[in-house]
Amino acid sequence: MLQRTPLFPLYAEYGAKTIDFGGWELPVQFSSIKEEHEAVRTRAGLFDVSHMGEFEVKGKDSVAFLQKMMTNDVAKLTDGRAQYTLMCYEDGGTVDDLLVYKKADDHYLLVVNAANIEKDFAWLSEHVVGDVELVNISNDIAQLALQGPLAEKVLQQLTTVDLSTMKFFAFADHVDVAGVQTLVSRTGYTGEDGFELYCRAEDAPTLWRAILEAGKEEGVLPCGLGARDTLRFEACLPLYGQELAKDITPIEAGLGFAVKTNKDVDFFGKEILKKQKEEGAPRRLVGIEMIDKGIARHGYAVYVNNEQIGFVTTGTQSPTLKKNIGLALISTAFSSLDTEVEVDVRGKRLKARVVATPFYKRTK
């Protein structure tokens, strides 16, 4: 039986086409991936991301615990701020990438990928020491993401809290949004400005309807996983299971900014990640653009002179750039810009070249 989010009963009303996404029945699209993608890039779109996992960490030893488990420096967080971070195994491979929200000195919220909820909770539980209470609240919490240049304008209609003062990666808890108690976070997974909204599961339908109603005149669309993927891909934001995995380190994936090997705490993977940061990793995630006609898909092999040098992690035709592009994890020796490589597309070797990333960056 597939799991469903609290918004599942509303999907049909909005024309959703659902798919099995890691054991969840979720909308791949409502109108079309291209229309939804364009709405987020030019106006705003609303996503149901209630399948994501939420853990609460409480207790006076919370910081020490999180510092041991996370690659980023959790001690630098102040109340009302969020941080992107990763959890690694001792060999540097990635357990998951996640967000850490600091509510108070002894109270944190972790937001993890849906497919990794059980694995992450087990990994964290195994290493709890001291006064730390770890609770999986995933089933109690719904998450909506309103993303795009008009996100603030639309959301502001529904709350008295001044959203214009909220910086990127800041959040406010207990905010009244359309009569619903909400944690409002200026974060996202699209490369655009936007907000991620956390509320009680039973309140999600009210919040969903209110946001779409408030955004009607601005052309805000409900959006599915298809557009979420093309948007995050253009912005070069990693997807666990593709750009990150148990055998891919954050350094290889180009996420060194979230790995603080200089923090005075030993965390899982620190030794190897420090070495890779200082000496370079054997593989590197790069952007590629197809020269020959064809689309590079996840898992396709990448070659130079008949030698396999890596594989494609994500690839598609970019709706914004109208180009066939991809992300590939390849041997660092071949990662310089403009290096010509070949991608095995269904048995044919097609030419591509290494290009700069991100493919898309919003203009302020």
From Swiss-Prot:
GO terms for biological process: glycine decarboxylation via glycine cleavage system. Its EC number is 2.1.2.10. InterPro entries: GCS_T (IPR006223), GCS_T_bac (IPR022903), GCST_C (IPR013977), GCV_T_N (IPR006222), GcvT/YgfZ/DmdA (IPR028896), GcvT/YgfZ_C (IPR029043), TrmE/GcvT_dom1 (IPR027266). It catalyses: N(6)-[(R)-S(8)-aminomethyldihydrolipoyl]-L-lysyl-[protein] + (6S)-5,6,7,8-tetrahydrofolate = N(6)-[(R)-dihydrolipoyl]-L-lysyl-[protein] + (6R)-5,10-methylene-5,6,7,8-tetrahydrofolate + NH4(+). The keyword Transferase applies. Pfam families: GCV_T, GCV_T_C. Keywords: Aminotransferase, Transferase. One of its GO terms (molecular function) is aminomethyltransferase activity. It comes from the Bacteria. GO terms for cellular component: cytosol; glycine cleavage complex. The glycine cleavage system catalyzes the degradation of glycine. PANTHER family: AMINOMETHYLTRANSFERASE, AMINOMETHYLTRANSFERASE, MITOCHONDRIAL. Belongs to the GcvT family. This is Aminomethyltransferase. The gene is gcvT.
